[in-house]
């Protein structure tokens, strides 16, 4: 099957796979971030009790862990935003795909015209 495909068809198929993997990565990334956020939210509900503790070291460690978790989650969200900007900025993939499809459609129309013309001439 691949032997019969034109270069344009192969390029289009490769670009389609690239877009699909970007979309899948985006979806997985967002689900992971949402899950991490929910876990953090559950832990934060128990933090006030720990912070009320009289044990200074436990208090300090709790605050340190909470701060670290918030930082890591915010970093992941920043990375996610950057990833989405990259995918959006890479809309040239979509533009290229549309151009490829247009060219392919035009080529098929030209092929049909040539076939009709050649039949009339023969």
Curated annotation (Swiss-Prot):
Keyword terms: Host nucleus, Host-virus interaction, Transport, Virion
Compartment(s) where it occurs, according to its Swiss-Prot or TrEMBL record: Virion; Host nucleus
GO process annotations (BP): exit of virus from host cell nucleus through nuclear pore
Cited InterPro entries: Flu_NS2
Chief place where the protein resides: virion
Motif Nuclear export signal location, chain numbering: 10-19, 86-95
GO cellular component, one term: host cell nucleus
HAMAP family with a match to the protein in the record: INFV_NEP (MF_04067)
Function (record text): Mediates the nuclear export of encapsidated genomic RNAs (ribonucleoproteins, RNPs). Acts as an adapter between viral RNPs complexes and the nuclear export machinery of the cell. Possesses no intrinsic RNA-binding activity, but includes a C-terminal M1-binding domain. This domain is believed to allow recognition of RNPs bound to the protein M1.
Subunit structure of this chain's protein: Interacts with protein M1. May interact with host nucleoporin RAB/HRB and exportin XPO1/CRM1.
Recorded family membership: Belongs to the influenza viruses NEP family.
The protein's name in its UniProt record: Nuclear export protein
Species the sequence originates in: Influenza B virus (strain B/Lee/1940)
Lineage: Viruses, Riboviria, Orthornavirae, Negarnaviricota, Polyploviricotina
Gene field: NS
